[in-house]
Regions:
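A short glycine-rich, Lys/Arg-flanked "PGG" loop and its adjoining helix->strand segment in the class I
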Residues: 134-149
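Acceptor-substrate binding/catalytic loop of class I
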Residues: 154-165, 190-206
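N-terminal, positively charged/glycine-rich alpha-helical extensions of SAM-dependent methyltransferases
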Residues: 1-26
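Conserved class I S-adenosyl-L-methionine
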Residues: 149-185
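Short alpha-helix
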Residues: 198-215, 219-223
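Conserved alpha-helix/loop element of class I SAM-dependent methyltransferases that forms part
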Residues: 24-51
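A short acidic, Gly/Pro-enriched loop at the edge of an enzyme's catalytic core
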Residues: 111-120
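Class I SAM-dependent methyltransferase SAM/SAH-binding core
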Residues: 52-109
Length: 263
């Protein structure tokens, strides 16, 4: 297990050096209006006033601070990249926003955080970095108070079975083992070095069953959209901020979202 964490941490440390200054993350716009959350996840958020929130796999903290902008009383960001958390702390300080940062792997329960949060949040490109979803869910729910909620919005598993041109099935839908690749550039920084990364595909059942099979967890909502809030491919846009794959419009889901409650 340590090997995959070391390989992927090296990748994300490198990306965290580049992403805060990328056009994709647009630091100038964020300083003017610290809000990067999209309609999919915002539709699931409760009233945040008075809430203590943990953002899992927060990268360098833009979404974390966006939760603060929406009125959260206290925000915490958790990530395994020390470079990312250094950037997150600098971003918060530059905006004079209060936030807390935790250096940890998302699947390893941090005892000091257990039972502390009203809401645990995770968004876009999170679960595929883990070989097994159950430990991730166990950690997320451990951090919630009774009655607290988990909200996840992520790219749909169907998207990950297709080749780079979205023309052919190139990868398994089910988790048949690690997918080892080398990639040059990142989704935000094309100049990123060529580096190895390890990922896993997970069917929807792997994501939902750790919730519905547990007697202290209640799946409140599950939804899918045939559009993405991110333009990460050659796209068409039937509405502002809703991107579909050009030539594949409406054929399959691009994003799923869920809300679950700790009983």
């Amino acid at each position: 297990m340590k090997e995959y964490l070391d390989i992927n941490r090296k990748l994300w440390d490198h990306w965290a050096d580049l992403h805060p200054r990328s056009d994709f993350y647009d630091a100038v716009a964020f300083r003017k209006n610290p809000m990067t959350l999209h309609e999919i996840e915002r539709a699931l958020l409760p009233e945040l006033a008075g809430k203590k929130i943990l953002h899992m796999q927060c990268h360098f903290g833009q979404d974390t601070l966006s939760l603060k902008t929406l009125g959260a009383a206290e925000v915490w960001g958790l990530d395994f990249s020390p470079v990312a958390l250094g950037e997150a702390a600098a971003l918060a300080q530059g905006l004079d926003m209060e936030a807390n940062w935790v250096l940890a792997n998302a699947t390893e329960i941090q005892e000091e955080l257990v039972g502390q949060f009203d809401l645990v949040f995770a968004s876009y490109g999170v679960l595929g970095w883990h070989p097994d979803i159950k430990p991730w869910m166990d950690a997320a729910f451990s951090y919630l108070k009774p009655g607290g909620e988990l909200i996840v919005a992520d790219f749909h598993p169907v998207l990950w079975i297709l080749d780079e041109n979205f023309e052919h099935i190139a990868y398994p839908y089910f988790n048949t083992g690690v997918i080892e690749e080398e990639r040059e550039g990142s989704y935000a920084s094309p100049e990123a070095q060529r580096m190895k990364n390890l990922t896993w595909n997970h069917p929807i059942s792997d994501i939902v069953l750790p919730i519905v099979e547990h007697h202290e967890r209640d799946l409140v909502y599950f939804g899918e959209t045939n559009w993405s809030p991110y333009e990460l491919f050659e796209s068409t846009s039937p509405a502002p901020g809703r991107y579909q794959i050009k030539g594949r419009e409406g054929l399959f889901p691009l994003v799923y979202s869920l809300k679950a409650r700790k009983l």
